């Protein structure tokens, strides 16, 4: 599963460096194309491996205040996670699966719950919502259908072929940051997330679950997640914002469910990176210091590339 985790970070981190404004200026067109090529290559390699021994997805449930959160771990090449918020009045799906095998499992599970789907939320990832209307953070519909994101999805379609669902065609309702949507009695607060993400969206669900692009995993971050030193500070700020909501669980479009302890680990990890950047004058010594600070932490293979970003 670590290969899937690594690939997921490669894919999701594309957005880290193409977010609006100053972040977008970090990369030139050639660099973006290089990253996209790498992402698609990794995806195809992962898909080839998965065809030999495909893993089925799995569901886990967590209790909120008056609702149940169903978490679907797709175990696909993206390591994507999807969610279902269940109340007595109906269901809300969040980040529906992208691949047909996952859509089949997810939809079958929804059918077994025996309640109507009253809303579908697409935060960071397009999925199998088809012609159904969706709810998205402000700016995300436009972002998904132009430029690099659109090209990335078309690249996935070309390489994955009929393993992927068709891209959604339903109408999108945009929610402004700071606004709360109440659906089936559960509140969904759309908030600004980290500036090094796209489009910097977080959703606080029922004051219990906080959804962001990826779960704060106990693993090294990589070169695509942190494009430069500014991104370190921006990611750290975003996690501190997430922590301020005092959620019981922290969700990610990649990675599933994490705890406040996991979040605290990632905050401490980024703080340590900031410290080591001031203490080490070159990339080699930085990598060695980070390894010593976190022995046996997954993701060491990507540290040289990460350091190259931070010392350029």
How does the language model describe each region?
Residues 4-35:
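Short, Lys/Arg-enriched N-terminal segments with co-localized hydrophobic residues
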């Amino acid at each position: 599963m670590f290969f899937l985790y690594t690939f997921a970070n490669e894919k999701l981190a594309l957005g880290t460096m193409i977010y609006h404004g100053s972040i977008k200026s970090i990369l030139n067109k050639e660099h973006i194309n290089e990253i996209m090529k790498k992402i698609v290559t990794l995806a195809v390699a992962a898909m080839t491996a998965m065809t030999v021994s495909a893993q089925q997805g799995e569901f886990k449930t967590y209790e909120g205040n008056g609702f149940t959160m169903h978490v679907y771990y797709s175990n696909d090449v993206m390591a994507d996670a999807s969610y279902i918020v269940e109340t007595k009045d109906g269901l809300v799906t969040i980040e529906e699966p992208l691949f047909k095998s996952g859509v089949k499992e997810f939809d079958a599970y929804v059918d077994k719950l025996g309640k109507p789907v009253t809303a579908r939320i697409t935060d960071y990832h397009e999925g199998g919502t088809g012609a159904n209307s969706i709810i998205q953070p402000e700016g995300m519909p436009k972002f998904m259908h132009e430029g690099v994101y659109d090209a990335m999805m078309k690249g996935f379609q070309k390489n994955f072929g009929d393993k992927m669902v068709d891209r959604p065609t339903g109408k999108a309702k945009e929610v402004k940051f700071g606004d709360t949507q109440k659906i089936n009695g559960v509140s969904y607060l759309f908030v600004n997330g980290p500036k090094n993400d796209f489009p910097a969206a977080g959703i606080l669900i029922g004051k219990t679950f906080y959804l962001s692009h990826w779960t704060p995993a106990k693993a090294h971050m990589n070169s695509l997640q942190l494009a430069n030193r500014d991104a370190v500070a921006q990611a750290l700020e975003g996690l501190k914002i997430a922590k301020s909501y005092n959620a019981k669980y922290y969700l990610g479009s990649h990675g599933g469910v994490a705890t406040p302890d996991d979040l605290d680990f990632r905050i401490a990890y980024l703080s340590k990176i900031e410290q080591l950047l001031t203490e080490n004058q070159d990339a080699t010594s930085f990598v060695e210091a980070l390894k010593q600070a976190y022995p046996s932490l997954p993701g060491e293979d990507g540290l040289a590339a990460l350091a190259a970003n931070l010392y350029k």
